[in-house]
């Protein structure tokens, strides 16, 4: 499963089992949707930073056409840098958000660029190779320029200090005021304002540049639409055909009302074996959590494994009723939480190559409340992770003792998958906003708190006797494997992705740290969880698993979707 390793990355392969069981028409549909997915790659690069595409193309030209000695450390280090750019869809780390530091000299790159045929370089009109270097080198080599893709540091202007390309010439205050003025507190079905546009200031006037056919990114979007039209012609049924048709309409109009109509049609299509996401979806890449990055996933249902998630979703009301949060924050009637295990046929955009293993959509609160949501666990990706991790020495190195290791070996894969199922299927779908509460009230903290809420819901229930009763886990000990690995990862091992001295910026990583630290600190008087030194190494030790579950429940109370307390979240 492992292809290669460089920097802090390991590249894995994944299998696409059961593809051959699809009908010829279904395979054709997967092919067209896959082509549509491939066309959006450059959108994401540009969203992540305005110079990313030109830096990538300049480096690709050198990588492909360099005539000098390729065995030098300069060339080899440039190759690693380029691979990191490919992996992170830009010049910033996909988790840490900090800019990559090139381990090759400016002189080397400049000589290489100036020695190239100018037609191979991404030159602007009338630009020389020398001017290209003058424009792009400071962005690459000066640590003070565009140092962070998404900055979440409290008290700073998050828009001006973030290198992502969602705003141009606009301050955080201006952006928040612009979208604040659009919102009507009485509107119970609001569109996701600002989701599919760049906010710019031109001639002193703030305006949106919409991503659509004829707007920004039209070259890529026209190609996406071309393949979607082909997919529409081989749809499995009328419902799916309507979904694809409405998505095409959204790409052509850029209207967020069309986007909501598409999302409602999509969430109601439960009969198709093949499903897909294609478009501006998640807002983690915007420090204000407003604008969505482009992503795509084409998949088909894993019929056998879906049985597990169907048991969970059919008991969704029981889980909602028995959660430890206040009754006023619970849904009286849980609407259509559909859950399935899927096989990914392709990952693209912001889902590639570092991908989610579980997804719950749509994101609009009112659509979830009125029409339900779709929750998926990506089975073949989880399987690749599990297969690559077995026997790599990680647990032998970091897990405190043999008893914990044996438990993780025995139950870890199963409880990990169950936690993902519970996180997506019930966690994101649980709870409700009280009337009049702005879903964006938590601003920059919204993404992290929402992820924490979903994780805590899953953690709280993975230890519930109900799971033994439903035959989802073999016994009452299994949950301890997930608790141990979650706490070890949150407190310690996930930090391998962060450079010393830097802060954790990515929402999912922040949430894991938040939960693990909460349990560690709140449980400290009773030594519920400890960090213990043994032979000069630090280990996580869990002394009281039942108390850990209680603390997860307490933390869940603080992250429930109402009343949206920003100082508490901070």
Q: Where are the predicted features?
A:
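Active-site recognition of the HExxH zinc-binding catalytic motif
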Residues: 419-432
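Single conserved hydrophobic/aromatic residue that forms the stacking wall/gate
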Residues: 558-569
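Contiguous, non-catalytic segments that form substrate-binding/exosite surfaces or channel walls
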Residues: 80-204, 208-406, 412
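Long, well-structured alpha-helical subdomains associated
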Residues: 15, 459-554
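N-terminal-proximal low-complexity accessory segments that begin disordered
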Residues: 1-52, 57
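An active-site-proximal "capping" alpha-helix that borders the catalytic cofactor pocket
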Residues: 23, 447-463
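Post-HEXXH active-site segment of zinc metalloproteases
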Residues: 431-451
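Short, glycine/acidic-rich hinge or "gate" loops at secondary-structure transitions
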Residues: 238-244, 259-262, 437-439, 467-483
């Amino acid at each position: 499963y492992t292809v290669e390793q460089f920097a802090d990355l390991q590249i894995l392969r994944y299998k696409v089992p059961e593809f051959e069981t699809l009908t010829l028409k279904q395979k054709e549909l997967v092919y067209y949707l896959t082509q549509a997915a491939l066309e959006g790659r450059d959108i994401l690069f540009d969203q992540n930073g305005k110079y990313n595409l030109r830096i990538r193309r300049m480096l690709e030209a050198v990588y492909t056409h360099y005539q000098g000695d390729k065995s030098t450390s300069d060339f080899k280090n440039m190759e690693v840098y380029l691979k990191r750019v490919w992996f992170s869809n830009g010049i910033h780390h996909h988790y840490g958000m900090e800019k990559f530091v090139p381990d090759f000299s400016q002189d080397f790159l400049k000589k290489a660029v100036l020695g190239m045929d100018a037609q191979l370089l991404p030159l602007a009109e009338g630009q020389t190779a020398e001017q290209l270097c003058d424009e792009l080198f400071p962005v690459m080599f000066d640590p003070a320029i565009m140092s962070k893709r998404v900055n979440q540091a409290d008290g700073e202007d998050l828009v001006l200090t973030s290198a992502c390309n969602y705003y141009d010439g606009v301050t955080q205050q201006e952006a928040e005021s612009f979208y604040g003025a659009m919102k009507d507190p009485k509107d119970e079905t609001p569109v996701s304002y600002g989701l599919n546009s760049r906010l710019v200031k031109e001639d002193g006037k703030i305006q949106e540049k919409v991503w659509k056919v004829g707007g920004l990114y039209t070259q890529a979007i026209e190609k996406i639409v071309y393949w979607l039209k082909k997919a529409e012609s081989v749809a499995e049924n009328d419902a799916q055909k309507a979904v694809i048709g409405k998505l095409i309409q959204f790409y052509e109009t850029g209207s967020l009302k069309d986007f909501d109509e598409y999302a409602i049609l999509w969430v109601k299509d439960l009969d198709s074996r093949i499903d897909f996401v294609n478009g501006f979806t998640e807002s983690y890449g915007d420090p204000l959590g407003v604008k969505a990055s482009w992503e795509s996933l084409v998949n088909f249902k894993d019929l056998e494994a879906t049985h597990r998630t169907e048991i969970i979703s059919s008991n969704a009301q029981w889980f909602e009723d028995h959660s430890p949060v206040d009754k006023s924050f619970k849904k009286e009637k849980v609407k259509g939480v559909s859950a399935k295990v899927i096989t990914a046929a392709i990952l693209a955009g912001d889902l590639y190559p570092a991908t989610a293993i579980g997804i719950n959509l749509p994101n609009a609160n009112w659509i979830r409340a009125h029409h339900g949501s779709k929750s998926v666990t990506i089975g073949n990706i989880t399987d690749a992770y599990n297969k690559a991790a077995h026997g790599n020495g990680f647990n032998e190195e970091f897990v405190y003792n043999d008893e914990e290791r044996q438990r993780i070996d025995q139950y870890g894969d199963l409880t990990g998958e169950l936690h993902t199922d519970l996180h997506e299927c019930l966690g994101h779908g649980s709870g409700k906003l009280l009337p009049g509460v702005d879903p964006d009230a938590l601003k920059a903290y919204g993404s992290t708190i929402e992820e924490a809420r979903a994780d805590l819901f899953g953690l709280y229930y993975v230890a519930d006797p109900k799971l033994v009763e439903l035959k989802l886990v073999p016994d009452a000990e299994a949950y301890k494997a997930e608790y141990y690995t979650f706490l070890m990862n949150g407190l310690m091992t996930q930090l391998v992705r962060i450079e010393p001295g830097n802060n954790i910026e990515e929402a999912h990583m922040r949430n894991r740290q938040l939960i693990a630290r909460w349990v560690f600190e709140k449980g400290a008087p009773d030594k519920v969880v400890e960090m213990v030194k043994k032979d000069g190494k630090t280990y996580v030790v869990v002394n009281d698993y039942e108390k850990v579950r209680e603390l997860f429940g307490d933390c869940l109370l603080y992250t429930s979707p109402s009343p949206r307390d920003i100082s508490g979240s901070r």
